């Protein structure tokens, strides 16, 4: 029971529930193996003039609240909810799954710019495996980088619905960074793409 509770704390757990287990304790020649220590990743509270705030690696990196509005079609296709979340200090993603033509995207961006307070930014959630949308938004037509270049306050790209191969992912990060996006992230939809996403992160200097 306790071994489950102790996961991530760095505490060592020794089995002593049977006579045999307790007998082995008297002949141990090495220290018990400890669990992994994940405490350095835990959130913490910081005290500011504006009140207590939650501090995480995410808040340190982005300066935004530790809860985000993830891109999801159709929920965050429309700009109003995205702008409202961004204005409240949250990371807020415009869902690329609903930006199906350049004219639709133009209309949504115009409304977004109208609704956003000065200094606020949003992020764009792109569907990598949808070849039509990817080519429209970041491939041959590049409507999102073009908007960024024209001053639209989109400061991040979240690559979802598929993870590129390592070389392609690294090249994509360099390209999007050069396009003016300081934040490029990958959103694994299942367990299997998590290791490739981690390898990509390790391959790119912070």
Where are these regions (language model features)?
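Active-site entrance/lid segments in N-terminal catalytic domains of soluble metabolic enzymes
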Residues: 2-4, 10-15, 21-206
């Amino acid at each position: 029971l306790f071994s489950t509770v102790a996961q991530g704390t760095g505490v060592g757990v020794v089995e002593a529930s049977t006579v045999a287990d307790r007998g082995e304790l008297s002949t141990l020649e090495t220290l018990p193996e400890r669990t992994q220590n994940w405490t350095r990743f835990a959130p913490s509270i910081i005290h500011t003039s504006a009140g207590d705030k939650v501090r995480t690696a995410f808040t340190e990196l982005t300066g935004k609240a530790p809860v985000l509005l993830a891109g999801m079609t159709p929920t965050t296709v429309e700009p109003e909810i995205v702008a409202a979340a961004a204005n409240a200090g949250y990371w807020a993603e415009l869902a690329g799954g609903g930006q199906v033509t350049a004219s639709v995207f133009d209309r949504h961006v115009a409304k977004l710019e109208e609704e956003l307070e000065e200094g606020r930014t949003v992020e764009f959630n792109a569907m990598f495996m949808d070849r039509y949308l990817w080519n429209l938004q970041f491939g041959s037509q590049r409507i999102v980088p073009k908007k960024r270049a024209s001053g639209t306050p989109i400061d991040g790209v979240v690559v979802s619905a598929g993870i590129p191969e390592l070389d392609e992912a690294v090249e994509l990060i360099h390209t999007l960074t050069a396009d003016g996006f300081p934040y490029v992230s990958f959103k694994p939809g299942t367990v299997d793409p998590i290791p490739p996403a981690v390898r990509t992160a390790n391959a790119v200097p912070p």
